[in-house]
Amino acid sequence: MATNAKPVYKRILLKLSGEALQGTEGFGIDASILDRMAQEIKELVELGIQVGVVIGGGNLFRGAGLAKAGMNRVVGDHMGMLATVMNGLAMRDALHRAYVNARLMSAIPLNGVCDSYSWAEAISLLRNNRVVLLSAGTGNPFFTTDSAACLRGIEIEADVVLKATKVDGVFTADPAKDPTATMYEQLTYSEVLEKELKVMDLAAFTLARDHKLPIRVFNMNKPGALRRVVMGEKEGTLITE
């Protein structure tokens, strides 16, 4: 397969789900997966790519589930946001151990734990090739971490949002349930909406569409997939205008 000599993106926003960090355990953080992801991010930095990362928190806490059981949704979402900060701390530690300069920012001020999110500071760090980990979602309840990824992607003027998942891309149906499901290589925003494909929640997706922010869905569990994506090779599903 032909490989471009240079990466096709200069600045990316990588969206990692909390589940991506839990490995086969089904809960918590798998240290070996964390270290592998840190190495893959390090490769991007060495290629000269500026990397922003938004991490979910579903491996530690899910607010929506407890909301159904009667917990106040705002309280549940605040707990979920704090779970993303815990994941961010773990990822920052893994990056530091891999000798990658990384800064953790939170949309909720947590003095003494990490920096508060500042758009200007994030841009400045990215320009200096620091990996910027963006935690606590948007800082508001009722918004998913996918919404946070698209919002931060637009704010930092990323070339693309790379949504790392457990499947190879966007399929015609759920590949786990339907063996005949096939993967799309490329889609437009309108096609995703027309076909009602589950890429991300509607608020997040329409935000990306309105700001013409491309989204690429790929499988982070495939070693080297992240590098192949940034080098412009066929990997995952690309969603653009």
UniProtKB/Swiss-Prot annotation:
EC number(s)?
2.7.4.22
* InterPro entries from the UniProt entry: AceGlu_kinase-like_sf, Asp/Glu/Uridylate_kinase, Uridylate_kinase, Uridylate_kinase_bac
- For this protein, what is any one GO molecular function term? UMP kinase activity
A GO term from the CC aspect? cytosol
The superkingdom of the source organism is Bacteria
The segments labelled Involved in allosteric activation by GTP in the record are 23-28
Reactions the enzyme catalyzes: UMP + ATP = UDP + ADP
* Pfam families the UniProt entry points to: AA_kinase
Q: Report residues binding UMP.
A: 57, 77, 138-145
Query: Where does this protein act, in terms of pathway?
Result: Pyrimidine metabolism; CTP biosynthesis via de novo pathway; UDP from UMP (UMPK route): step 1/1
Task: Provide the family line.
Answer: Belongs to the UMP kinase family.
Q: What does this chain do? A: Catalyzes the reversible phosphorylation of UMP to UDP.
Looking up HAMAP family in the UniProt record yields: PyrH_B (MF_01220_B)
Among NCBIfam families, the record links this protein to:
pyrH_bact
Protein name, UniProt field:
Uridylate kinase
Q: Which organism is it from?
A: Shigella dysenteriae serotype 1 (strain Sd197)
Q: What's the name of its gene?
A: pyrH
